[in-house]
């Protein structure tokens, strides 16, 4: 017999500390927690093997191909400071292992099987370096930040949004009315909640028609371009496309998709349609916490964000730093920059394990949403800068006088912060003062400040 069968020691073939990574390799950083007694090199090598060419035993067909050319390699292991049994394993994958333009295939290869590995207690994909050669096979976001600003004719400030609540139970006519009030009051966008698809109490077509009416009425009265994220997410790709096509026929500017529950394949199809037909695409990340919340197992959100930029979306929800959902400031800013910028330097303090060059892939606007209100406005404009969408759901609709005054309060607070910044004031330290001054000439803002002055989500 020409080779020895039986379970093999992955370390022999797949741990290659001397390997020099190529510009075309896809690089991954895994946080691996091996079972007691399993050395980290063996665990890292096992991850490299099973997510590329390896199987658990030597097979006859290994002789029919060139493993040296196609195998994943674990080229570095570093201990995690302050944690006993955990290491960061760096793995390089040859580009030929992946289908062009398919986020789906990339994930199936890299995270498809290895997360159930017996030798590991837990495994987390912390970051991916997507090589330029692979980036170039993706269309990416349908339009990107600059084109969106040009379409909306809104410059030099963050955009304002609002999720219509109660998320489930309104009839289409009342839903459209809520949309109109918010847009009329001064918001740029309103949003379907992620779980509003087409339920018995409000079918999608009725909602689309009433929302389109609300958009056009508000546009005519304010002289500003308005939008409502019409959620096209559906049970089948065909139905999703049908909804997107109907939105285009109504002439509205933007549709929305839940990219994790809807799936990357559906999302990429929708993104291509949106670019071909001039629709902006708002992406919601429902289900992300299932994947990214555990510190030692799963996939970090920065990887899901990179994947979305490749698959395509013009906005994506990315945490708030200040509201009700968790997210540490530096880490959040790390993936916010990954979404917006062309080139991001490796910076471990922000959780960025690799330098990422996006070449000319358009950027994505980060959306801050979840438990934020007018008092957060200075912090949000300071943290996220101009290229962002700030979304106040309850922070608009919870206004004691109703939706339109709630929208007015948010718009006034935003404009006050932008003006203060232009005047050179420090938003971080003078934030509360800036908002207080603005309340003097805006009764709507004064009422909002009164309602939310005590609320904090602290756990």
UniProtKB/Swiss-Prot annotation:
EC number: 4.1.1.39
Residues modified as N6,N6,N6-trimethyllysine: 4
Residues bearing the modification N6-carboxylysine: 191
Binding residue positions for substrate: 113, 163, 167, 285, 317, 369
GO molecular function: magnesium ion binding; monooxygenase activity; ribulose-bisphosphate carboxylase activity
Cofactor note as given: Binds 1 Mg(2+) ion per subunit.
Tagged with keyword DNA damage: no
Location of this chain's protein in the cell: Plastid, Chloroplast
Site (Transition state stabilizer) residue list: 324
Family: Belongs to the RuBisCO large chain family. Type I subfamily.
Task of the protein: RuBisCO catalyzes two reactions: the carboxylation of D-ribulose 1,5-bisphosphate, the primary event in carbon dioxide fixation, as well as the oxidative fragmentation of the pentose substrate in the photorespiration process. Both reactions occur simultaneously and in competition at the same active site.
Name of protein: Ribulose bisphosphate carboxylase large chain
Organism: Apium graveolens
